[in-house]
Amino acid sequence: VVIEAVGLSDLKRFYDLAPKAATELARIAINQSAERVGLKLAQRAMAAQVNFPRGYFSEIGRSGKPNFGMAYRATNANLEAGIAGRQQPTSLSRFATERGRFVGGRHRRGTPITVTVQPGRVTTFKRNAFFLRLRNNNIGLGIRLKNGEILTNTHGAKLITSGPLKGVALLYGPSVDQVFRTVAVDISPEVLDALTFEFLRQFELRSADL
């Protein structure tokens, strides 16, 4: 999602007064409104829809970037900033109440696993789901399928086709990117208001030097 200077309806008037300063102040306003307002509003809106675990947005993934954050910042040459979320589906184990017990070695295989993807909507796997350790110290939630069985209502379930786990499907919930795109339009007006306010505030602070 992009935050850019075209949202500043009065920008041309300020460019006519002080083009160099207007560019610099627009850059500052875009970056600050994206980081201080856009990110926080989006995280709050996403958390209301999907039960992402605490701290998940700031976790650093294999790409070296956080699961949700600034993709790039505005520069004087390019007056736009980008916000992006992790595009890979989120392991369903992240939404499981018993995940912490598994990490601590206290969860016995075959006992029920409770998953809450959407706040207030709980799904319990009685016996057929289990945690398993994956590469890079990740933890997955899997379910062993019967011959000919097909999964429905999943977000990119991955079927293991060889080895001792052949026939096990790794289960996933929505990606951060997917959820972010559903809330981006709703938060846009407030982000634009913050952008306009910050630009005018910065211009007022600098007006004596122009």
What are these model-predicted stretches?
Residues 1-210:
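Short, Lys/Arg-rich flexible segments
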